[in-house]
Design a protein with these regions (language model features):
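Residue-level signature of catalytic and energy-coupling elements of molecular machines
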Residues: 34, 86, 199, 274, ...
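A generic structural signal for residues located within well-ordered alpha-helices
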Residues: 33, 37, 104, 213, ...
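Short, acidic (Asp/Glu-rich) active-site segment that either coordinates a divalent metal cofactor
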Residues: 85, 176, 189-239, 243-244, ...
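Acidic/polar, glycine-rich intrinsically disordered N-terminal extensions of enzymes
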Residues: 20-53, 57
């Protein structure tokens, strides 16, 4: 019966291809997808991609899959692959407003590689996904240039990606970013909250600003309703930066200084926390065992002025601020107390300004703040 229907349909002149095309075909380009512009975008990013390549990269742009040699792990006793994926969130809206698209590429890489660094992993390679309303090769090239910068900072090779044009779903100037990275760590050298002991020392690494979390709140209380002129005016309370520049400061990438410590002093770092969404309160506890607390001494570190600036605008108290933003600490290391001085020396040699911010005490896997009321003590503008 099925075969008869097919034959009869083909015998009907109204169902043949010529009659369909006579009615006028709709091309992919007419539907809003410009494959020619896509090809131009690929050409525009080639140099940026190539500058991230490592010796282990196999193949080149244009293949169906990114290739990377596993020989990188040949000297490891028990190599473990570590993967991470993340995005930049609504910080992209500020990049669009400013017409500046490279820094969010750095943010994208930072969010992924800093996460896998929490296991002690060395980032190996990175892939990106760009969804955009209307493909513009110049904007894509700027975004990918930032991604390549982030890859170079972290040592990850950019071995693949996707540019997806979404006409009718996204506005022409709208875009979103996602990233995916893979790293490797030798199992005996993995960082693990289970290794944390009473008396271990907390060393904080400074953030550059808000990083890439909390921007829905930031936009609501700081930028919504403001003109572009206002947002580009230098602000004394931001050290002379404009609001836009301060908010678009890219997320710091901690891979090279932390990996330097891990290579030179195996076992000195027990675990570490990447301070992202949820602030210090909801991230530092992820680096703890269930029977230990992190005693954090508030006021022992400084914070970029944009953080109290935003907290003031949102009328956040200390408790809420600490569970929303990084408050000046982008990463916290849990360190063997006998190795603190050596760890500090290595970090300083790598250009960091590490600070001892607390210690590990018996508890229940929580963050315990000492002198919480001092959070904004050196930043009176936050309390205005």
């Amino acid at each position: 019966m099925t075969d008869r229907i097919k034959v009869n349909a083909m015998d009907n002149d109204e169902t043949k291809w010529p009659s369909w095309t006579a009615q006028g075909a709709t091309t992919y380009a007419e539907a809003g997808v410009d494959t020619a512009e896509g090809a131009r975008a690929v050409d525009a990013i080639k140099d940026a991609v190539h500058r991230t390549y490592r010796d282990e990269v196999r193949g080149d742009i244009g293949g169906f899959g990114g290739l990377f040699s596993i020989n990188v792990a040949k000297n490891m006793a028990d190599p473990i692959l570590v993967s991470g994926t993340d995005g930049v969130g609504t910080k992209i809206q500020l990049a669009r407003l400013a017409g500046k698209h490279d820094t969010v590429g750095i943010d994208l890489v930072a969010m992924c590689v800093n996460d896998i660094l929490a296991t002690g992993a060395e980032p190996l390679f990175f892939l990106d996904y760009i969804a955009i309303g209307k493909l513009k090769s110049e904007a894509v090239a700027e975004i990918v240039s930032g991604i390549a910068d982030g890859c170079q900072m972290s040592g990850a090779a950019l071995i693949g990606g996707e540019m997806a044009e979404h006409p009718g779903v996204m506005d022409p100037n709208e875009y979103d970013l996602s990233g995916f990275c893979v790293g490797v760590v030798d199992r005996p050298e993995m960082l693990d909250p289970a290794k944390v002991q009473e008396g271990d020392v907390l060393i904080g690494l400074a953030s550059s600003g808000i990083h890439s979390n909390g921007y829905s709140l930031v936009r609501k209380v700081v930028t919504d309703g403001k003109t572009l002129y206002e947002l580009r005016m230098p602000q004394e309370s931001l050290g002379g930066q404009s609001v836009l520049d301060a908010l678009l400061e890219p997320t710091r990438i901690y891979v090279k200084p932390v990996r330097s410590v891990l290579r030179q002093l195996p076992g000195a770092v027990r675990s570490l926390a990447h301070i992202t969404g949820g602030g210090i309160t909801e991230n530092l506890n992820r680096a703890l065992p269930e029977n230990m607390d992190a005693e954090l001494h508030v006021g022992t570190w400084s914070m970029p002025p944009v953080i109290p600036f935003v907290c003031r605008a949102a009328h956040l108290d200390e408790h809420e601020a600490l569970k929303t933003f990084n408050m000046g600490l982008g990463m916290v290391l849990v360190v063997d107390p006998s190795k603190v001085d050596q760890v500090m020396d290595i970090l300083e040699a790598e250009g960091e300004t590490p600070t001892v911010v607390g210690r590990i005490i018996p508890g229940s896997g929580e963050v315990a703040y000492v002198d919480q009321e001092k959070l904004f003590a050196d930043n009176p503008s936050a309390e205005e």
